[in-house]
Amino acid sequence: MSHPQRFQRTPLAAALGFALLPLVSSPVHAQLEEVVVTATKQAESLQDVPISVNALSGDSMREQGIMTFDDYVDFLPNVSDAGNAPGMREIYIRGSATEQGSVTVSSAQGSAPGVALYLDETPVSFGGRNLDVYAADLERIEVLSGPQGTLFGASSQAGTVRMITSKPALGEMQGRVDVGMSSTHGGDTSSNVEGMINIPIGDNLAVRAVGYNNRQGGWIDNTASTFTPSGPVIDRNSLGYGPYFRNFPDTVIASVSNQEEVKDDWNEATYTGYRVGVKWDVSDDWSALVQHSSQKLDVEGSFLIDPSLGDDMSAKFQPESNVDEFDLTTLTIEGRVAGLDIVYAGGYLDREIDSLIDYTHYNNGGGYITYYLCSGNIYADPGPSNQNTCFDPRKAYSDTTTNERTTHELRISTDQDRRWRVMGGVYFSDVETKTLGEFQYYSSGDAFSDFQVQYYGAAAQSPYQLANETIPGVAGTNKVGPTGPLTTFYNDYTRTEEEIAFFGQIAFDITDNLTATIGARKYDLETQLQGASNFSFGCRYGGNGGGGADAGFCNSHRFSNSPTDRFLALGGYNNGSISDAQFLGLLNYPGAEQAYGASAKEMFRGGGSNAATLQAIKEGRLDISSINGSGVTEEDDTIIRVSLDWRISDDIMVYGIYSEGYRPAAQNRNAGQLGSNQTGIYEGYVVPAVASTDELENMELGIKTELLNNTLRLNASVYSTEITDLQVARFDPSNVAFLVFLENVGDAETRGLDVDFMWAVTGRLTLSGAASIMDTELTAINKQLQGVAVPKGSELPLAPSFAGNLRARYDFDIMDGNAWVNAALVYRGETVTGIVGSAEFMTDTHNLAYGNEPGVSIQDEGGTFGTVAVSNGSLPSNSRYVNDAATTLNVGMGYARDNWTAEVFVNNVTSEEGYVVQTAGKFTPESSMMRPRTLGLRFGYSF
């Protein structure tokens, strides 16, 4: 198969909106080809779909070197993303951004994403840890802006991204090999190889297989550094918890060097995987497709930099890694019966993630740091030793997460040529996520040793098993046996989500040119969080608290926390099966009374008590209305979508849309806990049991045109979106709780304009571009978040007021082949980071801990942040970090002859840094950044 001339390729390789496709032209003619998409679960021309849809063809992705999640997000003006590294990101569309929790808790305590990610017909969304599918042998990527909930369900709140794989082709032998290599300025080399083969077997059966390996070299250096914990920082974060840091004259504070972890270009990522598909045309009316995809993403090092150190540098004290593997098996059956089209799509996703993250920065924010870090006279009452020592401050987080998802969808539709067109279906999804997250503190064994000798005498042996094992008999836990000697705290959770939904859509041609469409989705959704958080508080507070642990163990289950039983209690009280008196007598887990007697802890301890939680329920400060007697949060609702489209002519269509979207509620593991600080704005504060569903309503007007004899395609849409009860993740150890939790910050709205065009100026020159103008605003702040979140009227994070791109491509004939040159200019405007927290407070922490400024701009949002004072004695401002505007330029030139292609390219010609500050789960700022200037070569052969 020869390399296609420009505009002589398949429709899906045509130029599309948002400048996603490379610029295209043909020496023969300049008309743009039709583009076919399945954004409405029906094959339709892009220009006939009354939705803002963008598509990127497989040919275009290969020509532009678009291979990963980061690559294809970069060229979408109304799309932004944030996160730590490949496989640890979140995507946002049209400014509907929030604040996702840290990756250390996203599996156990994260919000569902607001943008759904699909691989073919299967949803693969995961909050905070997007499934980073390598773009090998894809037919196209479709990006649907605005709520798509009626057809695509939960998490299609702000939009949907669909990755459509190339299917086996019947009756044709095909193959392709692509290789490439590149070098990043100041960094390592990268390489990739991909291969595809399509084999027909008879007339009605075909097999298609693709395999790939892509290694992306690093450019960030982990530099030599020394860390010494700061007493003033520790003291102010201990507010409400203690113990305070007691800096006696003879106190020894250990420092730590990261010399063993110093390495150049240490942020590497390697994608390795394959996909096999078999298609069988059973008859003229029925076909079946089975596919299996498997991938391993292996990330080494950190993709975050410390902006105070300068460009391209981090200072981590532990090795970092993220191994993310998935297997996805899907079955699609299509048929026709009695004039009805029938489609069944089923899938099973099995994903496993193993992560290791440096957690030494927790010394700058944890509420109990002196407890874990120091021994001796750090309390008002001296300990068993007169020595005052703070030990090795290194900390690490180790995580193992498994995610299993089973989906089934059956839909039926009528003939699309009729005046009345109907589609209806049923959808079922069952998701289970298990996570074991171990927080490993190097200091704890030494800090606890004197106390263990006091309680166990000669029988005490070091190192101690600090966190023994999960509370026995608690549903949803997965750990068997003790943890390692450094594990001081760990999460052991199972999250489940089960949904059944019925959906339908009716389209009616009022006239030949005017069509009305109405769709609806009725869903029933059940979510549950089970398991336990396990502490080592028994290692100091009375040894094992009378629990009788064997020598060498110091954990006490009486200090552990069981969300399983918290939600059973809250649900039982909600349905009346638990009385006030019974609620007041609840203990932290079943059997605690038998194990610990009078020393057993109350279930809702922390900053409060069972009585305080009960009072919060009675006063309406703690909503438990959605929790049933089994501890499950139940939601059911119906969302709708209504559109009207008018085809003014064969080349112009205008449309209007009203649509709704949603994402699931989320349970909190510390549900019902009273905040530790009950003064000022925190008076009466209680951790929500459930962060309720946040809902999005969208109104949109759009136009789609093909002008100048189909040489110019111009599409635009203007929209207004309202979000109710926006979910946000929050970590406030100084005032509320040292566990991350979710809550609803308030309401928001976004308004904007999206424009894209493609213009075949001549038979050889093509221009394309896209722009997004957005205005976002928090329109209401819930009472409990006033003075904690940014004030009403503030903009949403990661939402630039302007973003755009412009591309040009020129084709010409030379040496019996086709050559081209292209360029792409991408601009993304200034944004801010976060909704809850104070940039001034984080900067002050950085100054105290490291003795220098973090080097990041701050935007004052007005007022003060309700937390402890900064070092000058005043309350910090309600402020956020600023991400500066960034402009990147990519250029390339290539040549194709017969079955061969070759291209040389330079991406990010000016080495634009494009910093985005990351604050979620952090105590001093870190930033992600763009890959610097990269020069490379690509070669391809197809047959």
Predicted regions and their residues:
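Outer membrane beta-barrel strand-and-loop segments of large Gram-negative receptors
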Residues: 372, 386-409, 681-692, 698, ...
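N-terminal periplasmic accessory domains that precede
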Residues: 69, 90-92, 105, 143, ...
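Gram-negative outer-membrane beta-barrel transporters
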Residues: 512-516, 711-723, 741-837, 938-942
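Membrane-embedded beta-barrel scaffold of Gram-negative outer-membrane proteins
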Residues: 332-360, 645-671, 690-744, 749-751, ...
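Structural signature of Gram-negative outer-membrane beta-barrels, strongest in the C-terminal barrel
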Residues: 279-284, 413-415, 425-429, 495-721
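Short acidic/polar hinge/loop motifs at secondary-structure boundaries
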Residues: 105-145, 195
